[in-house]
């Protein structure tokens, strides 16, 4: 009897302890969630880019073209879901099956699951079905390419999926670069998107190959479909995301910053495409609901977590940023309706919509080739002749010099069919755009560009001619930023001793004028574009608008943290880092069992353990 009473008391005590532990855990969770909600509060934060009432993208069509199943999230994962929710029709095109080490079924299932996490249904996804990690893009005609995992030499898809070529033509396409170009061309023309987001020339085999294939396909489309001129934005997934600095954990969200030189294919330039200047990038703000002070709350992290086989979630602290960065490729080039000839060199390279190319596609630091038309040194003329099929009105010509820093065109002359001419000074030696703007010339049937001076050798990558010098990107945008750090601002926190904040603004139309004003808040004043805080400041709201279009706006909040609040945040950040590591471990463990990597993981563990004691297994 006494023993039973003791057992009951012991059980009761254990239950009480367990209940106390549960209550303690719940209390900690409640405190954590409360603090997180305070930090993440975006009341008062808004941007017209995502305004559902005045959506610029409602009933518009966007197509994303990327190599692998997960690149879509890096290309526009923080932007696309809200645009889709606001009425934009989207298509995500995956060029390869991502099947070098993992099955196509696994990659395709992960991609669909990830997009569904963001609210984008499976029917919006298109798989082209080409192989992953091959040098198919630079092989000569007749040379075969095969899938590493299946040995197939033609497009295919995982169980339950159908690749694009088979759906459209009823047959599989042989693995050739020409077939990929053909499929990209067809999928674009089938859908005719208003906007195309495409991968750019990352130091990765498939990223380079798909970028070059897309540009070739686009060149063919623009030359055959003169009435179709989509807005094109190209983006990098490696230098600005996958291999960027892991800077998620900070008091305020960081924007994408200039790539680390050592991470680039050629550190001579600012990006992996020499023609791109960092300051010319297009900076799209992310939707306010896509960021949180806890990475586990970010929708993109949840989507990346579906890509178990790629461990994409591990890089979330690099991928999730305060903006998304692109470069515009204009499609209104008048040379698309013209013939081009040269006194020497390769005329086809001058208007092929392609800035860069490479032969050794697998080498991260391979020398760029096949993209510059070089004049023979003995050529006394060194002239490009452009003849239009129909008379044109021209107000701007863009010249792209050979990006070899030692080979520069130092002077030239543009001559037009109306008898006029323009002297051209030295072109930008890094190959970036040299824009020659002039009063509109009407009825132009042809023009020439003659090199009159050069260093080492003379060559041109591209020539473009436009009716209008300024380009309409297809949307209107303004976004406030920290003028000192260049980071975009959303719900922004300042420390207890900060007395001012210099504001700047990114505007999609660089010629547009804008105004910044305080809409509420005490203890703060606006001096020009500088916010000045006094000791009593707590919180304010700031709004920026275009002067000629008040429907294009941005609104942010600024809040001061006390000493206690700042210490609390620092502790909070440490907890978040730990939670991120724990959840990453959870997802890695899940991958071992879901994708059958148990023995592969065990093998790596044993191999690394033996390596530490000096035993190397090849």
List where the protein language model places each region.
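Active-site beta-strand->loop->alpha-helix modules in alpha/beta enzyme cores, enriched
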Residues: 10-20, 24-227
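Extracellular interdomain linker/stem segments of modular secreted and single-pass surface proteins
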Residues: 469-470, 559-567
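Predominantly extracytoplasmic/ectodomain segments of secreted and cell-surface proteins
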Residues: 473-512, 529, 533-538, 552-554, ...
């Amino acid at each position: 009897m006494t023993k039973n009473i003791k057992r009951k008391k012991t059980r009761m005590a254990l239950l009480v302890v367990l209940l106390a532990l549960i209550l303690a855990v719940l209390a900690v969770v409640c405190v954590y969630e409360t603090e997180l909600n305070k930090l993440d509060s975006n009341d008062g934060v808004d941007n017209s880019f995502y305004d559902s009432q005045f959506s610029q993208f409602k009933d518009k069509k966007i197509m994303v073209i990327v190599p692998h199943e997960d690149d879509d999230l890096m290309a526009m994962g923080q932007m696309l879901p809200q645009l889709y929710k606001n009425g934009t029709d989207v298509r995500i095109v995956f060029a390869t099956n991502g099947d070098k080490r993992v099955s196509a079924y696994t990659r395709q299932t992960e991609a669909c699951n990830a997009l569904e996490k963001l609210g984008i249904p499976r029917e919006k996804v298109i798989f082209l079905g080409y192989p992953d990690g091959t040098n198919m893009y630079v092989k000569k005609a007749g040379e075969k390419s095969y899938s590493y995992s299946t040995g197939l030499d033609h497009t295919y898809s995982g169980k339950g999926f159908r690749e694009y070529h088979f759906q459209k033509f009823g047959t599989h396409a042989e693995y050739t670069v020409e077939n990929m170009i053909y499929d990209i061309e067809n999928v674009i023309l089938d859908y005719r998107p208003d906007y195309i987001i495409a991968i750019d020339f990352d130091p990765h085999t498939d990223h380079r190959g798909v970028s070059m294939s897309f540009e070739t396909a686009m060149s063919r489309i623009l030359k055959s479909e003169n009435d179709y001129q989509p807005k094109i934005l190209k983006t990098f997934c490696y230098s600005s995301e996958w291999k960027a600095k892991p800077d998620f954990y900070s008091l305020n969200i960081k924007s994408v910053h200039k790539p680390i030189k050592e991470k680039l294919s050629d550190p001579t330039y600012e990006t992996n495409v020499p023609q791109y200047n960092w300051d010319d990038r297009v900076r799209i703000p992310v939707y306010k609901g896509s960021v949180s002070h806890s990475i586990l709350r970010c929708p993109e992290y949840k989507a990346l977590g579906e890509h178990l086989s790629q461990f994409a979630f591990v890089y979330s602290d690099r991928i999730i940023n305060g903006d998304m960065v692109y470069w515009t490729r204009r499609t209104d080039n008048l040379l698309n309706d013209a013939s081009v000839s040269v006194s020497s060199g390769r005329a086809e390279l001058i208007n092929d919509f392609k800035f860069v190319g490479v032969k050794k596609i697998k080498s991260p630091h391979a020398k760029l080739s096949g993209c510059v038309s070089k004049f023979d040194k003995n050529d006394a003329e060194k002239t490009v002749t452009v003849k239009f099929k129909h008379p044109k009105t021209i107000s701007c010509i863009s010249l792209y010099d050979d990006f070899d820093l030692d080979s520069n065109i130092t002077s030239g002359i543009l001559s037009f069919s109306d008898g006029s001419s323009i002297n051209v000074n030295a072109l930008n030696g890094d190959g970036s755009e040299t824009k020659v703007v002039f009063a509109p010339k009407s009825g132009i049937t042809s023009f020439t560009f003659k090199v009159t001076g050069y260093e080492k050798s003379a060559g041109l990558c591209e020539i473009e001619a436009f009716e209008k010098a300024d380009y309409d990107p297809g949307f209107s945008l303004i976004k406030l930023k920290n003028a000192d750090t260049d980071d975009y601002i959303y719900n922004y926190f300042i420390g207890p001793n900060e007395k001012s904040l210099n504001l700047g603004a990114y505007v999609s139309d660089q010629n547009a004028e804008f105004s910044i004003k305080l809409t509420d808040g005490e203890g703060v004043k606006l001096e020009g574009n500088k916010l000045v805080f006094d000791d009593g400041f707590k919180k304010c709201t700031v709004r920026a608008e275009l002067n000629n279009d008040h429907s294009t706006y941005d609104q942010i909040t600024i809040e001061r943290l006390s000493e206690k609040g700042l210490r609390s945040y620092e502790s909070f950040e440490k907890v978040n880092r730990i939670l991120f590591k724990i959840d990453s471990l959870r997802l890695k463990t899940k991958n071992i069992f879901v994708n059958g990597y148990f023995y592969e993981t065990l093998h790596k563990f044993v191999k690394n353990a033996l390596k530490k004691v000096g035993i190397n297994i090849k």
